[in-house]
């Protein structure tokens, strides 16, 4: 009797493959990320807080009335009709400097008002330090100026000149009744 031997060749199982996939992204200080979004949220809250505090204390109204009617510009403005080297020399300017000045945050302040025909709006710069970045935040507050509102001198004191009595104030009288104009003060802030 013959015996037959059968040999079976088993193949070894294939080794598992491991693939590594890498994705690289450069992150700069101004890249959108969770931390930069957090910084923007803080700047937004700070801008809103400055405006709210200034409105509550009356400093915001005093700041929009801090107008040199003979020079047709804000008092002590460094260039043109507005400030370029720092905030206005008043309580609102002090608040802006406290909140933004020491943190490396640049800001512009604009005052938007109704134009003479009552339908269009115009914008007066109060503080302008440059073009905002793409990550700039904006906050605004409206100040309703009455016909009885009085311009402020360079020390912040009342001049005795009502806005309704001068033609040299940047915003014209467009409302009927006791309201002179509604001024929207906007702070635009960004990290430098």
Residue positions per predicted region:
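N-terminal single-pass transmembrane signal-anchor helix
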Residues: 1-22
């Amino acid at each position: 009797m013959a015996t037959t031997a059968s040999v079976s060749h088993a193949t070894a199982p294939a080794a598992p493959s491991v693939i590594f996939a890498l994705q690289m992204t450069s992150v700069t200080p101004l890249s959108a990320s969770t931390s930069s979004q957090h910084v923007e949220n803080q700047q937004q809250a700070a801008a809103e807080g400055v405006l709210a505090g200034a409105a509550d204390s009356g400093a915001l109204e005093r700041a929009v009335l801090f107008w040199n009617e003979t020079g047709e510009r804000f008092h002590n403005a460094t260039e043109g009709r507005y400030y370029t080297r720092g905030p206005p020399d008043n309580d609102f300017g002090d608040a802006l400097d406290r909140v933004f000045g020491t943190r490396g945050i640049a800001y512009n302040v604009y005052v938007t008002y109704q134009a003479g025909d009552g339908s269009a709006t115009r914008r007066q710069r109060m503080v302008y330090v440059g073009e905002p970045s793409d990550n700039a935040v904006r906050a605004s507050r409206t100040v309703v100026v009455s016909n009885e509102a009085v311009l402020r001198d360079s020390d912040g004191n009342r001049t005795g000149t009502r806005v309704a009595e001068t033609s040299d104030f940047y915003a014209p009288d467009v409302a009927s009744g006791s309201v002179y104009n509604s001024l929207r003060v906007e702070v635009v802030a960004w990290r430098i």
